[in-house]
Design a protein with these regions (language model features):
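Catalytic beta/alpha-barrel core
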Residues: 194-201
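Alpha-helix-loop-beta-strand connector modules within alpha/beta enzyme cores
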Residues: 175-192, 209-217, 310
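N-terminal hydrophobic targeting/anchoring segments and the immediately downstream early-domain regions
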Residues: 1-174, 225, 229-284, 288-338
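Acidic, glycine-rich loop-and-beta core segments that form the ion-binding/anion-interacting portion
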Residues: 203, 211-224, 230, 234-235, ...
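Alpha-helical elements of the RecA-like P-loop NTPase motor core of helicases
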Residues: 26, 204-207
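A generic "binding-loop/recognition-motif" signal
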Residues: 161, 201-202
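Short, hydrophobic/aromatic alpha-helical segments in well-folded domains
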Residues: 143, 181-185, 205, 269
Length: 338
């Protein structure tokens, strides 16, 4: 099925296009202004027809080398925002709130399923907030509720390194399970209604999360092991278990996890996940602005129609609509609640 870019953008305008992962906030760009830097800002998101964008908050750098403080200084963060992992998280939440205020109603931090549907009906972009790593709460479980009150609606227990809550999937981290603190954090997340992102969980931490009876589990950005690629890709067994719980897996656009740097490599991972999870379990979790390379031909979010075209050459419109956002619309509508 050959389509022109204009035809694809018309589909994007009609569909609920959704992306479950962008690290744009840490770069301290003005998201209200179109930029030649990075992958995402409000003007580019609206241009491509994005309806739901998850903005994820990073508070700690790579293991062994650290460097987040230096990164934040380089990007012009204020001193008080850099002081701790907690202040880093709160500052990024506040930054997104200010950007949304300045958008004059075009973008809203979205905390309920009803608000998501209202935004869709009224042509607004829904911004959903997530946290990469429970180290952001600095061991204080009560801060989960505070983050929820501030608008955060999902969190990964770990990110690029082990923390007090559990184990990271990053190499040489030792495959640690959830700690007693991690179990308490998970229980509190379930209580307040916060989704659990397993994208960076070690296998043992992931197993502990999946054992929780009510955790709202999904993966915001990942490849799948059965299609090849990188070190933290999810196994078919995990994909099936996430699907059984009503979760969705966002397929990443990073070549290091795809095992190749072509758009067709993204399609290959999507198709493998579809074969394991079914049509309701697969979405897009780009990892835009996550300091990763993108496939050839994709320079930023405005090139998303190229992936849409590739999918439409192989699959019917109804399925492509689900992959590009319908499944995450359903997941967040159910997870966010009323």
């Amino acid at each position: 099925m050959a389509l022109k870019t204009g035809d694809v953008l018309e589909l994007h305008r009609r569909w609920c296009i959704a992306d479950s992962h962008a690290d744009s906030l840490m770069w301290n760009r003005d998201l209200c202004e179109r930029s030649s830097e990075g992958h995402v800002d409000f003007p580019r998101l609206r241009e491509v027809g994005m309806k739901l964008q998850c903005f994820t908050i990073v508070t700690r750098g790579f293991p062994f080398i650290g460097g987040f403080e230096a990164f934040a200084v380089w990007r012009g963060w204020p001193k008080e925002a850099r002081e701790s992992e907690w202040t880093r998280a709160v500052w990024q939440v506040d930054q997104l709130a200010e950007f949304c205020r300045r958008s004059e109603g075009q973008v809203r931090i979205t905390t309920t399923g009803r608000a998501l549907e209202e935004n869709l009906a009224q042509g607004r972009l829904s911004a959903v907030l997530g946290i990469e790593g429970a180290h952001a709460i600095e061991g204080q479980v009560e801060r989960v509720a505070e983050l929820h009150q501030r608008g955060v609606r999902f969190m990964g227990l770990t990110h690029l390194s082990n923390n007090e809550a559990g184990g990271s999937s990053f190499p040489l981290m030792g495959n640690r399970p959830l700690s007693p603190l991690g179990h308490s954090v998970l229980e509190e997340m379930a209580r307040v209604g916060m989704g659990v992102d397993v994208a960076h969980a070690s296998e043992r931490t992931l197993e502990d999360i999946l054992a929780h009876p009510t955790a709202r589990v999904f993966s915001s950005h990942t490849g799948v092991r059965g299609a090849g690629g990188g070190w933290r890709n999810l196994s078919d067994e995990v994909l099936r278990r996430i699907a059984e719980r009503g979760g969705v897996v966002g397929i990443i656009l990073a070549p290091v996890y795809l095992g190749g740097d072509a758009i067709d490599d993204v399609v290959r991972h999507i198709e493998h996940a579809l074969g394991v999870m079914g049509e309701e379990g697969v979405g897009i979790g780009s990892d835009y602005d996550g300091m990763v390379a993108l496939p050839k031909g994709i320079h930023d979010v405005t090139d998303l129609p190229k992936l849409t075209e590739a999918l439409l050459r192989r699959h019917p419109e109804a399925l492509v609509e689900r992959i590009l956002g319908g499944n995450f619309r359903r997941y967040f509508r159910e997870t966010l609640g009323e």
